[in-house]
């Protein structure tokens, strides 16, 4: 991922030789272009999902080392209720997307971009008024990762205030607080 690019947000390389295959995810305002690139996730060895928060969409790209090409296979437009989605994890049945309004901790979103359900709340040891939840959600922006083998979603706030472990298979949630949590 290239955030300081002039033309393309993504560059694919061979491994372990690191030979350039293709640049893709053209920067721009056109229908086939991207306004931004917040994150990406490998879908398979030759396919990635990429999030464009400004267009509120996730694109799936197929990459061919043989043809030196990247083709947009799918565009998933996110529902307007998913305001400013900045991260995601794909599971076998849905996307998991943090809620940056602070009403919930994250959303389960179907592969059409529609919310299925919201889960959890912002971890804090104090009961905070609802009017400050959006600010807290932005301040506690989390890094997220999902392990498809055991159904574990881990969320860690950027400054380490909390670590959350959601077991999506057993429907359990554990929160560990840091010194400023």
PLM regions and their residue ranges:
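Asp-box/WD-like beta-propeller blade repeats and closely related beta-sheet repeat scaffolds
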Residues: 55-104, 124-125
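Short loop/turn segments that connect beta-strands within beta-propeller blades
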Residues: 15-17, 62-66, 110-114, 167-171
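Blade-loop segments of beta-propeller domains
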Residues: 19-54, 74-79
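Beta-propeller fold detector
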Residues: 20-27, 69-78, 116-125, 130, ...
């Amino acid at each position: 991922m290239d955030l300081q690019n002039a033309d393309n947000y993504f560059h694919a390389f061979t491994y372990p030789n690191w030979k350039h295959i293709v640049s893709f995810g053209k920067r721009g305002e056109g229908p086939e272009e991207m306004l931004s690139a917040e994150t990406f996730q490998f879908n398979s060895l030759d396919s990635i999902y990429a999030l464009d928060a400004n267009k509120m969409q996730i694109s799936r790209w197929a990459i061919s080392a043989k043809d030196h090409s990247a083709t947009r296979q799918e565009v998933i437009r996110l529902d307007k209720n998913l305001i400013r989605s900045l991260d995601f994890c794909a599971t076998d049945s849905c996307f998991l997307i943090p809620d940056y309004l602070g009403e919930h901790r994250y959303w389960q979103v179907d592969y059409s971009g529609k919310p299925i359900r919201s889960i959890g709340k912002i971890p804090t040891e104090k009961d905070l008024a609802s009017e400050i939840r959006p600010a807290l959600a932005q301040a506690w922006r989390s890094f997220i990762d999902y392990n498809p083998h055991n159904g574990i979603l881990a969320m860690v706030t950027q400054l380490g205030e909390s670590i959350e472990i959601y077991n999506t298979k057993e429907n359990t949630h554990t929160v560990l607080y840091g010194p400023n949590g």
